[in-house]
């Protein structure tokens, strides 16, 4: 980020140890505390982590955390993220840490990865929908996106993907009911493609925003995929 100067960052670092492989990361304490409430609370001076400037996150993934660190310093997700499951992992990590802007950037990246202009659009796989349902709650933006994606697949999806769709509804408890309710909420109108931002789905349709957010969505500003649905 252009505004990250040595004065603003300070010179105090914290050590974060990730995953069973114990990969170490050293980041500026001021920056990571300003990124999300989870790390702000953890590195508050009253707690052990704040006193020792050290934290162990044994259940998190080192690749995902490295992407988080890169995003934290640069202000955008690294280019070339094309694996939907990896992006789903990033979203879930951001949800855990309540890094709202990272969540929104990950959602943009997921839409773009599934709507790849070079090698063609993709649907969510059975394993991806299963993982989303296992790690989200009702109303979470990522689950709503998965439901919207399945709803679109029912009407407009590739006939060759029917087996994947049926297996998803069989394996993911409650997913079919969620999708049918979602379709009913459209009131008879055709379901829109949720991979496309800037038409019947607003650019921020699957973002999280609060009343305290900036007037302009940073994730939307950083997005390059603003296409209209005609």
Q: Where in the sequence are the language-model features?
A:
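Short interface patches used for recognition in eukaryotic signaling and trafficking proteins
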Residues: 24, 49-56, 91
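Short, solvent-exposed helix-helix connector turns and helix-capping sites enriched
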Residues: 36, 99, 169-173
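Long amphipathic alpha-helical assembly cores
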Residues: 55, 156-189
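Cytochrome P450 catalytic domain signature, combining two hallmark sequence patches
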Residues: 37-52
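Post-BTB helical module
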Residues: 56, 63, 67-161
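C-terminal helix/juxtamembrane-tail motif
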Residues: 174-230
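N-terminal BTB/POZ boundary and linker segment
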Residues: 1-31, 59, 63, 70-85, ...
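Short helix-loop-helix/strand-helix junction enriched in hydrophobic and basic residues
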Residues: 28-40
